[in-house]
Amino acid sequence: MYDFVIIGGGIIGMSTAMQLIDVYPDARIALLEKESAPACHQTGHNSGVIHAGVYYTPGSLKARFCLAGNLATKTFCDQNNIRYDTCGKMLVATSELEMARMRALWERTAANGLEREWLSAAELREREPNIIGLGGIFVPSSGIVSYRDVATAMANRFQAKGGEIIYHAEVSALTEHAAGVVIRTSQGREIETATLIGCAGLMADRLVKMLGVEPGFIICPFRGEYFRLAPRHNRIVNHLIYPIPDPAMPFLGVHLTRMIDGSVTVGPNAVLALKREGYRKRDVSFTDTLEVFRSAGIRRVLKNHLLSGLGEMKNSLCKSGYLRRVQKYCPSLTVNDLQPWPAGVRAQAVSPDGKLIDDFLFVATPRSIHTCNAPSPAATSAIPIGAHIVSKVQALRESQSNPGRTLRAARNVDTLHAAFTR
């Protein structure tokens, strides 16, 4: 019997495993991942941005964890020889409406304690000769990294300290009882643990349901489609270039991202995916599609955002429509500059009353803790999220009348998190 089993080998699961084994070095800890390597889903299919914390409600978990995670991610990269680039983010307003929204973001960045600089149109053009706008905000602490590399380093650290990673282990059933949780996999394996930790991303709600618990949300998958610019445009921008987002929408808009390999990507958009892991337009699951349209909450979201949703679908099918979104601030790009690039799928939790759950969300049962909503900036925030989960695990074990074998916490989780932010 394991003391702890973590389900999910993305960056949240790996961060949690890495920190849990530091707190409980004598514990038997396993991580189950259905794929053959870490970071095969959301972690390995995102923009790679180290976010600063521009957009998030002051005092929210997103705001707090992003600010801490920005520094923690860079420190972890320094400790593990992972390349990153603190290139800064430029927010660009292209209309008077966006200027008004940008002023609100200016106040929010102040409330979140960020260093930033207000730029006039001329100052913006001086910094970014290929970008046009009425003004901008420059946030110097944003950066870029490969989160797949970060998650892999976390996995290596976990294994080096005695943790076990079991790949090709897709969970098919969970049974919670007084002394722990029994895990069954599609490969016919049965594993028992005193405490279960769910970091299942796109499958988070299904994992909770396996325990016989109504999660109070459903995961709605949104595919984010990208293009890569032709190599001659690798130096078209000096920073990460973001539009001013519509505050009514949960996503940040199509942006230009300087990738860590030197290329520049455009994206992502946000299109309803008809399969939980539907990375291609042709990926359709009848079961997943039926589940989406049976959900009153998701139907309400689609109704409330009908026009924008139809616009996203149109731009997904028509490259010229997609291009026009980025030409608002980078007019020199042409359709021929947009080259194919892999898409990602974002797991967005939706409440039964049709609200897009904005903050990070955690759900607990007597023997388990689950990360249930971890959209952007979850990758940036992975180390503080992992520390948060470990603190919840410690509290859960203390509340259990029979927590399994006695384990001594070798380190306080706050001290552990501080090790990544020195």
From Swiss-Prot:
Cofactors demanded by this protein: FAD
Gene encoding the protein: lhgO
Cross-referenced InterPro entries: FAD-dep_OxRdtase, FAD/NAD-bd_sf, L2HG_DH_bact
Compartment(s): Cell inner membrane
Organism: Salmonella houtenae
Record-level GO BP terms: L-lysine catabolic process
Function according to Swiss-Prot or TrEMBL: Catalyzes the dehydrogenation of L-2-hydroxyglutarate (L2HG) to alpha-ketoglutarate and couples to the respiratory chain by feeding electrons from the reaction into the membrane quinone pool. Functions in a L-lysine degradation pathway that proceeds via cadaverine, glutarate and L-2-hydroxyglutarate. Also displays some oxidase activity in vitro on L-2-hydroxyglutarate with O2 as the electron acceptor, but this activity is most likely not physiological.
Keywords (A to Z) from UniProt: Cell inner membrane, Cell membrane, Electron transport, FAD, Flavoprotein, Membrane, Oxidoreductase, Transport
Domain of life of the source: Bacteria
Main subcellular location: membrane
Protein family according to the UniProt entry: Belongs to the L2HGDH family.
GO CC term, one of those recorded: plasma membrane
Catalytic activity of the protein: (S)-2-hydroxyglutarate + a quinone = a quinol + 2-oxoglutarate
Protein name: L-2-hydroxyglutarate dehydrogenase
Enzyme Commission designation: 1.1.5.13
Coiled-coil intervals, chain numbering: none
Pathway: Amino-acid degradation
Pfam families referenced in this protein's UniProt entry, alphabetically: DAO
Classification of source organism: Bacteria, Pseudomonadati, Pseudomonadota, Gammaproteobacteria, Enterobacterales
GO molecular function: (S)-2-hydroxyglutarate dehydrogenase activity; 2-hydroxyglutarate dehydrogenase activity; flavin adenine dinucleotide binding
